Amino acid sequence: YFHDKQRVATKRAGALAGVMVKRIINEPSAAALASYFDTRQEQLFLVFDFGGGTLDVSIVDCFDTMVEILAVSGDNHLGGDDFNEAIAGGFLKEHQLQQKYLSETEYAILLRQAEKCKIALSTLPETKMTAVIGGQTYQSVYTNERVMRESSGIWKRMQRVLRHALQDGRVSLEEINAVI
């Protein structure tokens, strides 16, 4: 989030570029506003921003030319990297290995392989994950079901953030018109 000096600097940069910056809005508001302008219908949005290391959930009401943020909730220590670590942890457990015995390089490569596995599962029913640890090659088969099982704690944390946003916004999931 921008602090005041960053907002002033952004407006000044816009002026230098010949653009009149009337207002600076946050990313969830911008996403909801962009979707709203596609339909021009009053809509209640749930903006689910799941980054590499953070989760932000916003409940945004768009009507006429107004955008109202009803609730914001988040977890600054929850993101896609947590799934990579869960996949890597499951891989190590399956092969009866412990992270503390891996070199930094081996663990970094394992995390990279876990991320590739996660990405592959977004379009494939299953994928193989291979890693060389201590000079030995290990391989595992991953499915979405396996990742769901190994990351159940992450899903529970995500649900808590979502429930908190809905409660703070005093809305039910059924009232949400669109998820961004």
Give the residues covered by each predicted segment.
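Oxyanion-binding/catalytic loops of NTP- or PPi-dependent enzymes
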Residues: 1-180
